[in-house]
Amino acid sequence: MNYGFKKISTFMALVFGLALIFELPYIRNSFYVPICQALNLTNQEFGVLSSIYSLVSLVMYIVGGFLSDRFNSRWLLFLPFAGTGALGFWFSGFPEYGELKIIFALMGITTVMTFYSTAIRILKGLGSRYEQGRIFGWMEAGKGIFAGLAFFV
């Protein structure tokens, strides 16, 4: 793999994006009790929110693969950040349970349908078929490093 500046910067930006965009829907892993208390949610209600996100995400993997092959990658990377950011802003306003269902469903769309599939397609194009294992291994390692650093910031 030719490790030019453009490839390395593209790789780092995508890995950073992959690490951070999934922090919001999976925030429950770190702040489960405080979120339940702040939003006045029961364990069952929070479980339903997680299920909504997971089910929407499952369907969106198929749709995302189709979209990433047919539309401009720049837009498919920009829109999820803007959409997830707007959903995070809405989430920070202590919404009602019905609104939370909408937020988590929309996060399944913004994080998986438009971002994940496009990021994976671009990462795949950064190296030959013999380098895919190394690229995806470094991607997973980088996601862990960036997510860990973001936790402390």
What are these regions (language model features)?
Residues 27-40, 123:
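Membrane-interface helix caps of multi-pass secondary transporters
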Residues 74-77:
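Primarily marks hydrophobic transmembrane alpha-helices of the MFS/SLC 12-helix fold
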Residues 82-96:
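C-terminal ends and interior cores of transmembrane alpha-helices
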Residues 87, 99-114:
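Hydrophobic core of transmembrane alpha-helices in multi-pass small-molecule transporters
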Residues 113-128:
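Intracellular juxtamembrane helix-capping segments at the cytosolic ends
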